[in-house]
From Swiss-Prot:
S-adenosyl-L-methionine binds at residues 162, 183, 205, 248. It is found in: Cytoplasm. Its main location: cytoplasm. It comes from the Bacteria. Methylates ribosomal protein L11. It comes from Bacillus cytotoxicus (strain DSM 22905 / CIP 110041 / 391-98 / NVH 391-98). One of its GO terms (biological process) is methylation. One of its GO terms (cellular component) is cytoplasm. This is Ribosomal protein L11 methyltransferase.
Length: 312
């Protein structure tokens, strides 16, 4: 069977949004070629567990590759992708050139091609994220492993925003805490919260593909006794109180529910948000404060921020 490899040249800012669009369109695998991976700050602090080949990365911008079966509707799919990506600037998301190219690949080639971009990565003092097909031995008894299968949705959990959310969870989750993960994606943040001692984690996503992916990864990590996954739009209809809410979403989506977060998280509880480019930090902080939160800490990595806020 022949497959089409669709490559989109975009920006780091647009990676999560474009990846989501591709998964929504039915991509069977997504690979991200980001040259920032070659020099990023966390590489110096924690050390990558694998070697990267600069020749496989673009000179500038980010290239996102997605794999689709060749069908009669492929051109219609590509046109729909282009339309969805072209809308992103209206949400203040810079897409760069947005150029789309197409290559034909054999099934045996695509089935392994995208996996070369995913390897074990230590993202904090506590956690290492390991793709399911990689063998990995923890370097110490205290190291916690999160196994992820990125084939279905939302990558391997090593984007700066995810990394910062996990580090924020390390700082804040206490044994016995109740947690809600809004926009769970792969389920990585819910799994991390469970492994940090949370007693109950509710993971929600509007996308049924994300729900399926999160359920699979939760089972894979043997945290299904703590984490429940469901389909839901943000915090609509969700009752509290809980100790902590975490949401790694686009800034524009975070702005839609600070008041709901204040309603659901208990007094003195925490709201961790990321997916926020540095230029929008002030806007998000002001919205959180208006809803009754106090900004306790801001984490920064590359051009992204994560905010830890406390409900007054």
């Amino acid at each position: 069977m022949k497959w089409s490899e669709i490559s989109i040249h975009t920006t780091e800012e647009a990676v999560e949004a474009v990846s989501h669009i591709l998964h929504e369109a039915g991509a069977s695998g997504v690979a991200i070629e980001d040259p920032a991976e070659l020099t990023k700050e966390r590489e110096q602090q924690y050390g990558e567990i694998y070697a990267l080949n600069p020749a496989e990365y673009p000179a500038d911008g980010v290239v996102i590759k997605a794999y689709f079966p060749q069908t009669d509707s492929l051109q219609e799919t590509i046109a729909s992708l282009k339309s969805s990506i072209d809308v992103l600037p209206s949400y203040d998301i810079e897409i760069g050139t947005g150029n789309i190219t197409i290559n034909e690949v054999d099934e045996e080639d695509w089935a392994t091609a995208w996996k070369k971009y995913y390897h074990p990565v230590q993202i904090s003092d506590t956690f290492t994220i390991v793709p399911t097909w990689e063998e990995y031995t923890p370097s110490s008894p205290d190291e916690k492993i999160i196994e992820l299968d990125p084939g279905m949705a939302f990558g391997t959990g090593t984007h700066p925003t995810t990394t910062m959310c996990i580090r924020a969870l390390e700082k804040t989750v206490k044994p016995g805490d109740t947690v809600i993960d809004v926009g769970t994606g792969s389920g990585v943040l819910s799994i991390a919260a469970a492994k940090l001692g949370a007693a109950s984690v509710q993971a929600y996503d509007l996308d049924p593909v994300a729900v399926e992916s999160a359920e699979m990864n939760v089972r894979l990590n043997k945290t299904d006794d703590v984490v429940s996954v469901g389909q839901n739009s943000l915090l609509e209809g969700i009752e509290g109180p809980v100790d902590l809410i975490v949401a790694n979403l686009l800034a524009e989506i975070i702005l839609m529910f600070p008041e709901d977060a204040a309603r659901v998280v208990k007094q003195g509880g925490l709201f961790i948000t990321s997916g926020i480019i540095a230029a929008k930090e002030k806007t998000i902080s002001e919205a959180l404060e208006k809803a009754g939160f106090t900004i306790k800490e801001v984490l920064r990595m590359e051009d992204w921020v994560a905010i830890i806020a406390q409900n007054a």
